Amino acid sequence: MAWIILVIAGLLEVIWAIGLKYSHGFSRLTPSIITLVAMAASVFLLAYAMKSLPAGTAYAVWTGIGAVGTAILGIVLLGESASLARILSLGLILAGIIGLKLAS
């Protein structure tokens, strides 16, 4: 159950990271509220997952999900570059996340 909660926390991290972009420095109300709620929920769920998972593993997986998810949405939604090096690097991060799950 802790792993499912951790994945949800990571997905919420993606929402708040993208929300930061759409909030324009917290100058737009609705994206700012969504961002702050997602931040709080993400950190709360991360802390809850850490009750059962090693802190280093949980934090690395959480940030990895956030980094990969945010980069993918940056490419898809925001028109950020999708170079081969970037895609391969995201694949390496994803492989690391999977490796941490398998090792714990």
UniProtKB/Swiss-Prot annotation:
What Gene3D superfamilies does the record point to? 1.10.3730.20
Residues in the Periplasmic compartment per record? 20-28, 78-81
Main subcellular location: membrane
The record's listing under Pfam families reads:
Multi_Drug_Res
Q: Where is the signal peptide?
A: none
One of the entry's Gene Ontology molecular-function terms is: transmembrane transporter activity
State the source organism's domain of life: Bacteria
NCBIfam families associated with the record: PRK11431.1
| Family that this chain belongs to | Belongs to the drug/metabolite transporter (DMT) superfamily. Small multidrug resistance (SMR) (TC 2.A.7.1) family. Gdx/SugE subfamily.
Question: Under what name is this protein listed?
Answer: Guanidinium exporter
Query: What gene name is given for the protein in this entry?
Result: gdx
